[in-house]
Design a protein with these regions (language model features):
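Sec/Tat signal peptide C-region and signal peptidase I cleavage site
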Residues: 5-9
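Acidic, Ser/Thr/Pro-rich low-complexity intrinsically disordered segments
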Residues: 10-11, 17-27, 32-153, 158-167, ...
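Proline-enriched interdomain boundary motifs that mark the N-terminal boundary
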Residues: 181-192
Length: 193
């Protein structure tokens, strides 16, 4: 038996190998120090290139406001992030504003020994604007809620600035948009000859 894996070499540290999010809460227990094979992220608010990154994707099912909180398991850890609309250009279009524009990013962080804590998109946590950072001069740690439309697909990159391996949670519970459907998969029709 021959099996060809079309995803050979793809890693969750690259957009093409991203984890598909399909629930309100995702826990990443093993953050990475890997940057993948492709340096996709050169976002507006990040002071440096992509580093120690993990990629996630989701497709909006119902219009609304997108909100998420990235909460480090260790409050001293500093996570930066960028969000891309990949509906038209896919992962290949990242870095090309017309194809897969960056719609939000945050690289705000405090200097040790101050804890960095959570970041993300959350107006209810004081979020403003759509591009905050870099460093401790251009906050806050949260961006304003983002209007999203059914059918749009997004890629979220989370970068592990402190290079900790402790991980984080991503919580979409404040979103008014539905990001995943609750319809169980149905078996495809088939015929027996």
């Amino acid at each position: 038996i021959f099996y060809a894996n079309p995803f050979y070499g793809q890693t969750i540290s690259d957009c093409a190998g991203a984890v598909v999010l399909c629930g309100d809460l995702y826990t990443e227990t093993e953050a990475t120090l890997n940057t993948g094979d492709i340096y996709e992220y050169t976002g507006a608010c990040n002071a440096s290139l992509e580093q120690s990154s993990l990629w996630y994707t989701f497709t909006v099912q119902e219009d609304g406001l997108l909100s998420f909180i990235i909460d480090p398991l260790n409050p001293m850890d500093d996570y930066d992030w960028g969000l891309f609309d990949i509906t038209t250009g896919g992962c290949e279009g990242i870095g090309t504003p017309v194809l897969s524009p960056e719609v939000g990013c945050n690289s705000f962080g405090l200097n040790p020994p101050e804890p960095n804590g959570a970041t993300g998109i959350s107006s209810s946590n004081g979020g403003t604007g759509n591009s905050n950072g870099p460093g401790n001069l251009n906050g806050p740690a949260f961006n304003a809620d983002l209007p999203v439309v059914s059918g749009e697909t997004y890629a979220l990159v989370v970068m592990n600035w402190t290079n900790s391996l402790e991980g984080y949670t991503i919580d979409f519970g404040q979103s008014t948009a539905s990001l995943y459907d609750e319809i169980p998969p149905a078996p495809a029709a088939y015929s027996v000859d």
